[in-house]
Amino acid sequence: MTQSFDAIVIGAGQAGPSLTSRLTVSGMKVALIERDKFGGTCVNTGCMPTKTLVASAYAAHLARRGADYGIVLDQPVRIDMRKVRSRAATVTANSSKGVENWLRNMKGCTVLQGSAQFEGPKEVRVGAELLSAPRIFINVGGRAIVPDLPGLNEISYLTNGSILELERVPEHLVVIGGSYIGLEFAQIYRRFGAEVTVVEMGPKLVGREDPDVSDAVRDILEREGIHIRTSAECIRFARGNLGVRVSVDCMQGEPEILGSDVLLAVGRRPNTDDLGLDRAGIALDPRGYIMVDESLQTNITGIWALGDCNGRGAFTHTAYNDFEIVAANLLDGDKRRVSDRVLGYALFIDPPLGRVGMTEAQVRARGLPYLSSTRPMTRVGRAVEKDEILGFMKVLADPSTKQILGASILGTGGDEAIHGILDAINAKTPYDQLRWAVPIHPTVSELIPTLLLGLQPASAA
């Protein structure tokens, strides 16, 4: 027997629960399906547990630096990994349970646990239950890519999910992948006391960023004793006495990296391969992402895709914004579009990188004339007071429209300070209006007006 609903939401990640709330408030009868843990990647294996680990690692780092601030410890810093893991697990469990309780107590919402599979464009099966609805919303997230590398099937390896279960500090952690996830874990475990090597296939770390940002990130990590190998074109694995042998050169006989543990952090893939999307006629791109239009509708009327599975943004905040876009178009008569989104994001190493808008390379690729200004964090009083002076700020602007095109803040508080620029871009505020702002002293953000005053023409060549 088929159960009929006004809407079906598949997945309880960042977009699904909030959308369910809006739909039920509007009077709809909604079925929400979750096959695993409530809260999605962010709550369970992403932002929340990892940033809890970042905080623990920062505490260890600051304790070791205590003498720099006149604080002398009587004994070396000791890492209690069981306590570290327990703390992260508690934060995760509380958040996940909060989402689950919210949904289960939501009037008009029926929660079903199990794997969803399409039977047609209006029908979804969950175990023995067959559901139907004129509106279906897919919010199934993604998972770590396991690359096809020689020897990988002969060794044990970690992903961003399984590494959260460790209750020990690896002797030597080899991180495959030099982008956001890999670098955050690299610094975390280095600060916990592990030897760490980062192996990146590309020519630089955080490959989407400008070379000056990439070089500064590398310098920060190498100062902490993290080994970095870029342009590793021939990565292969074998078992070794310590645990694993990792080769990175194409020439046989080249020195190997001897590690105890391997973390794979080479990217993410969408969880779309077991949904039966073909039975609904839903189109995918070559990488398995669900293709959507500007309002996040798929090629099938009445079906939407939100969050990591649509390939239009791989962040918690973009997934939540997907919910806002769908709700605005469907319920509020507000024609919001994905392309209107001003994308900001952060790399949560210490010091963090806050980013918004275009990189300098992207501006040049478009052949745009632009203004540029850069200032080191040594010019920021707050950074000097904290003795955390690594990094710099950079801003790019259009000389004719006076719009800010993009910015990078790599330094203490950069993940927070970048929001002033993000908001200005979103509000289309000309940069010359920000020049005369009177920011609070002492803060990281107070250098932004000075940064804007320093804008000078740059070549687009």
Regions found by a protein language model. Give the residues of each.
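FAD-site-proximal beta/loop scaffold in flavoenzymes
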Residues: N153-P170, E256-D332
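Glycine-rich dinucleotide-binding loop and its adjacent helix/turn
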Residues: C47, V140-E195, V199, H227, ...
